[in-house]
């Protein structure tokens, strides 16, 4: 089975006006995008519905976070049921900024993943190691630990609705990027773990994408790797070069 290429744009807490957010999507709507690449953008929560309304057929929308409860006294949270009801197909979970700034554990990420799937959402599941963990040779172990909590919550058939985003924490927003071989090696390790922990079928069919200072200059080389199925892009998704990243596999 050929895994379709996937490029997501995580806007984080940007831009600071709805007009600017709409302009980003309108530019994508007009762009010549590779039709074989699945394109998803994740605007701030306030902009989800207006962006969903104007996004063309080639652009899907993702929430940046969701809670693991469907409703209740959880001030400030958004439930997966609400996201699904709004017609938003994707949600990003486990991003390193959520893990570090908001102290989300792998177990919490796993609960959120289960809740999102139960409500019909597709999940962009983020994993990745810190610079210290990489220097200690623990990259594979850290990624496996983060994945193992999710594996415990999922059935084999659930994985068809998961995209794994490997994002080394030391490369996010720093301008540093994992070398092509470093990224490919970790993606292979992720597949080896999935083959053992879930099944060879899931390991073969699950898309594993790379994130961490991806830009137009390095995207083609990264996209040429056998086990890199796309990108989760941060800052560059707010710039015109995002189109070039989407088209990284285009001849």
Curated annotation (Swiss-Prot):
GO biological process, one term: glycolytic process
Isomerase found in the keyword field: yes
GO molecular function, one term: triose-phosphate isomerase activity
Active site: 95, 167
InterPro entries, sorted: Aldolase_TIM, TIM_sf, TrioseP_Isoase_bac/euk, Triosephosphate_isomerase, Triosephosphate_isomerase_AS
Pathway: Carbohydrate biosynthesis; gluconeogenesis; Carbohydrate degradation; glycolysis; D-glyceraldehyde 3-phosphate from glycerone phosphate: step 1/1
SUPFAM superfamilies: Triosephosphate isomerase (TIM)
Alphabetical keyword list: Gluconeogenesis, Glycolysis, Isomerase
Catalytic activity: D-glyceraldehyde 3-phosphate = dihydroxyacetone phosphate
Family per similarity comment: Belongs to the triosephosphate isomerase family.
Subunit comment: Homodimer.
Protein name: Triosephosphate isomerase
């Amino acid at each position: 089975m050929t895994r379709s290429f996937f490029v997501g744009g995580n806007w984080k807490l940007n831009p600071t006006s709805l007009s600017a957010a709409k302009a980003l999507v309108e530019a994508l709507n007009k762009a010549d995008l590779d039709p074989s690449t699945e394109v998803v953008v994740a605007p701030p929560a306030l902009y989800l519905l207006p962006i969903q309304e104007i996004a063309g057929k080639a652009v899907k929308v993702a929430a940046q976070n969701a809670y693991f409860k469907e409703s209740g006294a959880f001030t400030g949270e958004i439930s997966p049921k609400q996201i699904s009801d709004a017609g938003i197909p994707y949600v990003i979970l486990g991003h390193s900024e959520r893990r570090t700034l908001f102290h989300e554990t792998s177990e919490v990420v796993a609960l959120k993943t289960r809740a999102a799937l139960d409500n019909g959402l597709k999940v962009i599941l983020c994993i990745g190691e810190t610079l210290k963990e990489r220097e200690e040779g623990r990259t594979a172990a850290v990624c496996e630990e983060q994945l193992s909590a999710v594996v415990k919550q999922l059935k084999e058939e659930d994985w068809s609705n998961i995209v794994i985003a490997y994002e080394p924490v030391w490369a996010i927003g720093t301008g540093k990027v994992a070398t092509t071989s470093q990224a490919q090696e970790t993606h292979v390790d992720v597949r080896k773990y999935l083959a053992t922990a879930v099944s060879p079928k899931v390991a073969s069919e699950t898309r594993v994408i790379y994130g961490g200072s991806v830009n137009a200059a390095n995207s083609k080389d990264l996209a040429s790797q056998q086990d890199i199925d796309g990108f989760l892009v941060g800052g560059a998704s707010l710039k015109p070069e995002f189109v070039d990243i989407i088209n990284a596999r285009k001849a």
